[in-house]
Amino acid sequence: MPQHAMGDKHFLSLPKHLFTSTSSTTDSGCDTPPSSRASPASLRSAHGALGSSSQPLFEPQVEKRSSQAACEVQYLSSGPQSTLCGWQSFTPKCLQVFNTPKGFLFFLCAASFLQGMTVNGFINTVITSIERRFDLHSYQSGLIASSYDIAACLCLTFVSYFGGNGHKPRWLGWGALVLGIGSLVFALPHFTAGRYEVEIDDEGLGTETGTCLTNQSQVECKDRASGLSSYRLIFMLGQLLHGVGATPLYTLGVTYLDENVKSSYSPIYIAIFYTAAILGPAAGYLIGGAMLNVYTEVGQRTELTTDSPLWVGAWWIGFLGAGIAAFLIAIPILGYPRQLPGSQRYVVMRAAETQQLKDHSRDNPAFGKTVRDLPLSVWILLRNPTFILLCLAGATEATLIAGMSTFGPKFFEAQFSLSASEAATLFGYLVVPAGGGGTLLGGFLVNKFKLRGSGIIRFCLFCTLTSLLAFFVFLMHCPNVHMAGVTTGYVGSLLPKGQLDLKAACNALYCCQPRHYSPLCGSDGTMYYSPCYAGCPEGAVTGPGGQKVYRGCSCILEKASSGWGNATAGKCASTCQSKPLLLVLVFVVIIFTFLSSIPALTATLRCVCDRQRSFALGIQWIVVRTLGSIPGPIAFGWVIDKACLLWQDQCGHQGSCFVYKNEAMSRYLLIAGLTFKVLGFLFFVAAYFLYKSPSVSSDGLEASLPSQSSASDSPTEQLQSNV
């Protein structure tokens, strides 16, 4: 047991000092001056007439306990006045109602919800509109998204080390303010770039017949060049501020919760916190999607429709609202004290669950408060094999989560032949209940079964193994819908194996441009690249169901009895029979992946000493982001690109992929997923065997601690009452 937590070694040596003289009282290691201690004479005078010859035998021990308690108060609490909720000297009684772990959890959940909604919701929803509005390439928008993680990695060491030994709510409050500034900066280009103006081509498809202009593509590509792409630097700055502001949230916020609640309740509090962070992106997708249905120039009339490839929605509204909300959330967080009332009693409980360490830093209460201790703090963590292995296991899980959350909708879009919005909606229906429910359930199970240390790691092993087995779902795939010139030949022609040819005799009369990708489904069940490549000579007419219908298409074999020769705008529906089973198993993969997230985080908090928890979480986040969150989307994107059949042509440069080979996509995702899942399983196995269980059970200590009702009393009285 660390001496600074309870001082048990001095208490156990009580019999040795029973018959010592009053002058034998010595300094217990505190910096308290002798004049501040009660003398035996003053103690005797306090007792009055009840004093006896035997009483002085105990008075020095009482004096020593008082000095020890005073020493403990210096480390455990700065005094009752520091536990009031408010701002500076303004601490009204009405605010103390919120000065509880539940009250702080509410505002912390609001901050994590807002961060998830902004960074993981709005950004992913509007990134395509930003590319179109500011003439950005995909790699440029990818750099904008990565700027968040880059900033977080750069700040994690500083914030977790100094913030962990500082006033955590103030760090969290200022972080929320920086997050709000980042949102306002991100919306700034809308107000400085001028109005969005676009020329609309009202001519029909029939104008593409006749002579093709050889320099038409070069002229259009030249006209597209502009200085709008330089605004990517403003977007990157906004994302950098997002990363800086969110850094304290998942390090200091977690440790502050863990420090101020009972150790068995900590997983539930942390699970609720992370569940709010997962529900945030879901709200971001819904709100961001709704805002994209509003034209970016609010109040200006336009002939564009939401189906037009030139349409740009009001992507900036969500960021303005997020910036204002962040400022409002920061105000109450800044008012919380360094420690919540009654938190002193949990120090001993947390120390009892910490694995046995030989770093000797726990004997020095002043350790970790200066920059000179930073190298030693890093070295202590690097010598902790359990901590390192849990970090590596978290990195493998983060790689899968980041990769699948980015390209999961694309997988559904290709496998089930869905539109981008339909695929994103379907993926959201799976992620919200599976991710949010798994996160909350993981914390509940740890508390329900009172798992500790090695038991938590065993639970992580079970979850990882289950999700690993369920990952074999990617052995299944849906067959590709037939697409003329890509997966099958046109009517009356054969498609050479391994070659693409969109041109055929049936569309030779039309000057079709490959950049005009507008898929349509023919009445023969085959999908075509565009109305032009389907040989449709006239524009679309509105059908009975409100869909655009093209008639008399020369590439579609016409039969009067069946009505062939027509086509409907959009992709052909998939006839995949394994879709229900595939969705169920993907749900299992997601829920068991998130089920181990809170237990793994709890295990990390239990394998390091108390004063290093914030710093340990910061180091872990650096490892997770550097080895997982940042390279995850890049690795999965590279793997998925290997399955591409048809690439977009952007003025001679390769753009995004239009058509994937479903079988290859499933196979590559299976290989990548199993690789990271097996690595994560092995890391958890090694962490389980290297974890050193504490020698003292926290359950026994918990029974000896003062009740919650007395936790807000004088810390000196609490420690004296335990003797």
From Swiss-Prot:
Database matches in InterPro entries: Kazal_dom, Kazal_dom_sf, MFS_dom, MFS_trans_sf, OATP
Main location: membrane
Phosphoserine: residues carrying this PTM: 39, 42, 45
Location of the protein in the cell: Cell membrane
Membrane topology: Multi-pass membrane protein
Domain Kazal-like, residue spans: 500-557
Residue positions the entry lists as glycosylated: 215, 566
A single GO molecular function term of this UniProt record: organic anion transmembrane transporter activity
Disulphides: 506-536, 521-555
Region spans: Disordered: 23-57, 700-723
GO biological process terms, semicolon-separated: monoatomic ion transport; sodium-independent organic anion transport; thyroid hormone metabolic process
Membrane spanning stretches: 103-123, 143-163, 170-194, 228-258, 278-298, 313-337, 381-402, 423-446, 451-473, 583-605, 615-640, 674-691
Known role: Organic anion antiporter with apparent broad substrate specificity. Recognizes various substrates including thyroid hormones 3,3',5-triiodo-L-thyronine (T3), L-thyroxine (T4) and 3,3',5'-triiodo-L-thyronine (rT3), conjugated steroids such as estrone 3-sulfate and estradiol 17-beta glucuronide, bile acids such as taurocholate and prostanoids such as prostaglandin E2, likely operating in a tissue-specific manner. May be involved in uptake of metabolites from the circulation into organs such as kidney, liver or placenta.
Domain notes: A conserved histidine residue in the third TMD (His-190) may play an essential role in the pH sensitivity of SLCO4A1/OATP4A1-mediated substrate transport.
Protein name: Solute carrier organic anion transporter family member 4A1
Originating species: Rattus norvegicus
